[in-house]
Amino acid sequence: MANFSESKSMMAVFFMFFLLLLSSSSSSSSSSPILKKIFIESPSYAPNAFTFDSTDKGFYTSVQDGRVIKYEGPNSGFTDFAYASPFWNKAFCENSTDPEKRPLCGRTYDISYDYKNSQMYIVDGHYHLCVVGKEGGYATQLATSVQGVPFKWLYAVTVDQRTGIVYFTDVSSIHDDSPEGVEEIMNTSDRTGRLMKYDPSTKETTLLLKELHVPGGAEISADGSFVVVAEFLSNRIVKYWLEGPKKGSAEFLVTIPNPGNIKRNSDGHFWVSSSEELDGGQHGRVVSRGIKFDGFGNILQVIPLPPPYEGEHFEQIQEHDGLLYIGSLFHSSVGILVYDDHDNKGNSYVSS
């Protein structure tokens, strides 16, 4: 387990200077135009996270009422796939946006597909770390605490496709995802977040990092040598080493304004949602960007989000087959951006 000091404020100044350079650059490698916006209406509110199975026929997303749903094309639309809560029922939970119902219905914040074993890992704010098979249904709960400290608000999850080991974050060890909990996290600048791993072969959960500053994202590298973790309130990404001479240690990687969830693309690079808070924090102005960076901390691309995501917090930006999937807590549709000249024939299930 590792701890580390905060980065220098000059890194934030450098980042903002770098953004100005990107915005004025004509290089397509740093700033690609949005060619098309696609919106797929969800049967429930706030589709915020995505994953894809090995068939590559559609996608999965988690929604506000506690479900994980699957989209299989414009003809089939969405179908229910999984529930983290064993108590989820249609009459009480379906399409609910009431936070008071989350303890019963659940609220999934991230999902990650294990291709080798054809199963999906789920992190839920109330039912914690779960797994469900390829047929879906009610998920099996795997872990609820680490070192005797219960999880309060699991938020990000990723699977090492080589080993099957699961890495996930807890936003806070004290406060949950209730409106009151969120307010306390922000007001106290909570630093009790954690990074954990779960080994399905031993069924053991291990604490890797603690005292994180609202860790809203985590993703493993393509070679499995490190995990990158986003600290929302520290405006930074840190790298935790899993292999090599630095194994078990963490280090500052790159400054990102208010980073959210992180997802790796097929090139081994990382996309992170950035909802930069201006004018006094969460009730002020927000600058919404998708930012791509590499494992060395180099910023490769910055994409200002178009309406309706412009100027608001968003949860996730994930690249798949040349499309960018946008996860948000404030809309009832899945936003998909075509941002370059990739051939998207493999994604014919997406209706345009």
From Swiss-Prot:
Enzyme Commission code: 3.5.99.13
Glycosylation sites: N95, N187
Keywords attached to this entry: Alkaloid metabolism, Glycoprotein, Hydrolase, Signal, Vacuole
Coiled coil ranges: none
Catalytic activity, reaction form: 3alpha(S)-strictosidine + H2O = secologanin + tryptamine
BP GO annotations: alkaloid metabolic process
Annotated compartments: Vacuole
Top-level taxon: Eukaryota
Top-level class of the enzyme under EC nomenclature: hydrolase
Pathway in which the depicted protein is active: Alkaloid biosynthesis; 3alpha(S)-strictosidine biosynthesis; 3alpha(S)-strictosidine from secologanin and tryptamine: step 1/1
Endpoints of the signal sequence: 1-31
Gene3D superfamilies tied to this protein: TolB, C-terminal domain (2.120.10.30)
MF annotations from Gene Ontology: strictosidine synthase activity
PANTHER family in the record: PROTEIN STRICTOSIDINE SYNTHASE-LIKE 9-LIKE (PTHR10426:SF136), STRICTOSIDINE SYNTHASE-RELATED (PTHR10426)
Protein task: Catalyzes the stereospecific condensation of tryptamine with secologanin to form strictosidine, the key intermediate of indole alkaloid biosynthesis.
Similarity remark: Belongs to the strictosidine synthase family.
Name of this chain's protein: Strictosidine synthase
Species of provenance: Catharanthus roseus
